[in-house]
């Protein structure tokens, strides 16, 4: 095992034997080290009634050499980690780690799989896999993701989702026309087979974000004449249908999502000069600000039971929703509006662009990222 601290993050690596390379386990955790501190290895039984004895052998402490080159995206390898976090305990569980960029998980309606995009395709990955950190010395090999057949749509971006009844997949894809994003719907059977996409939006670029609880309406973001606003179309529409514009304020409006009862569409807007969460009725009326804080808040997502809203929060100094930033997933209680921190991570763009709650409302799926040295040999 190797623990490496770089900047404000601590990384855990696991090796499978002498001479074998250490592989990152994913889920880097920000650790606020400052000044003098002690380092070491500890063991916990996670049970107050259990006393454990452990022997650590072959332990070395190696500081980075003076003048070592800082790790940046240009001189490092990017690792993506699919994680889940429990709402009640904030315990994070690693599901899948890959030396590549994948993005924006959805959790299927039956709870059996995750969907995410990678290299222009949509992939399916089983939800019931052991955490490689807690699975023991010889964890079982991780299964590989399986691509869903999306026919000609091979430039899918990170705005995709699943219909309320679990039978259809909506994608945003850049394969046709001028290669600007368009919204499509395709049938799926158990999130396995796929099919020919049906084009929904006539105009581009358009990016899907929300599906009404009754399955009849899609909400999406479109750039029209230089302004990004929120629009809707029937889920049964074809590319000849006219879209309905819901927002007209100057500045970016993004991330529309319906509440589970269908009474509101929540979204993020910078119309006040500061990105905050807003809401409106499904016809665009009664637009009002929801969050009023010093964070830049993006992408509101609701638990299926309607009790919680999660959002992606950047420091107020960050413009837009870039990748490779220190961010927080923050949880708002819909009962009293109280906001708590659910997870701190390195990510941003692609972490939770789309709905990713578990069907039982107990967990949230997201993607975190790590920038690590391209080679990490074992000693």
Model features per residue range: what roles?
Residues 1-70:
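Extracellular glycan-recognition regions
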Residues 68-379:
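Sequence signature of WD/YWTD-type beta-propeller architectures
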């Amino acid at each position: 095992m190797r623990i490496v601290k770089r900047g404000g993050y601590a990384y855990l690596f696991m090796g499978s034997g002498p001479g074998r390379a250490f592989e990152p386990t994913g889920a880097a955790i920000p650790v606020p080290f400052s000044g003098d501190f002690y380092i070491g290895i500890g063991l916990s039984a996670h049970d107050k009634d259990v006393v454990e004895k452990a022997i650590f052998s072959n332990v070395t402490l190696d500081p980075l050499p003076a003048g070592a080159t800082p790790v940046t995206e240009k001189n490092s390898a990017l690792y993506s980690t699919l994680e889940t976090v429990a709402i009640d305990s904030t315990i994070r569980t690693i599901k899948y780690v890959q030396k590549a960029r994948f993005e924006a998980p959805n959790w299927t309606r039956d709870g059996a799989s995750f969907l995410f995009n990678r290299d222009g395709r949509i992939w399916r990955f089983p939800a019931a896999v052991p955490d490689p950190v807690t699975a023991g010395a010889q964890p079982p090999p991780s299964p590989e993701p399986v691509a869903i057949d999306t026919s000609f749509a091979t430039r899918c971006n990170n705005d995709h989702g699943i219909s309320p009844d679990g039978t259809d997949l909506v994608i945003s894809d850049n394969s046709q026309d001028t290669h600007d994003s368009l919204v499509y719907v395709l049938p799926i059977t158990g999130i396995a087979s796929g099919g020919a996409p049906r084009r929904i939006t006539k105009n581009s670029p358009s990016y899907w974000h929300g599906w009404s609880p009754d399955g009849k309406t899609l909400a999406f973001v479109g750039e029209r004449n230089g302004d990004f606003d929120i629009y809707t179309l029937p889920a049964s529409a074809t590319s000849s249908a006219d879209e309905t514009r819901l927002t007209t304020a100057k500045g970016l409006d993004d991330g529309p999502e319906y509440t589970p009862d269908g009474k509101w569409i929540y979204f993020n807007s910078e119309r006040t000069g500061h990105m905050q969460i807003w809401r409106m009725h499904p016809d665009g009326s009664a637009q009002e600000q929801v969050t009023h804080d010093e964070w830049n808040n993006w992408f509101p997502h609701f638990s299926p039971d309607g009790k919680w809203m999660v959002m992606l929060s950047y420091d107020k100094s960050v413009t837009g929703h870039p990748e490779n930033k220190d961010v927080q997933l923050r949880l708002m209680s819909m009962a009293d509006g109280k906001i708590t921190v659910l997870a701190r991570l390195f990510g941003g763009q692609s972490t939770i662009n789309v709905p990713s709650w578990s069907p039982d409302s107990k967990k949230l799926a997201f993607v975190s990222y790590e920038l690590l040295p391209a080679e990490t040999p074992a000693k």
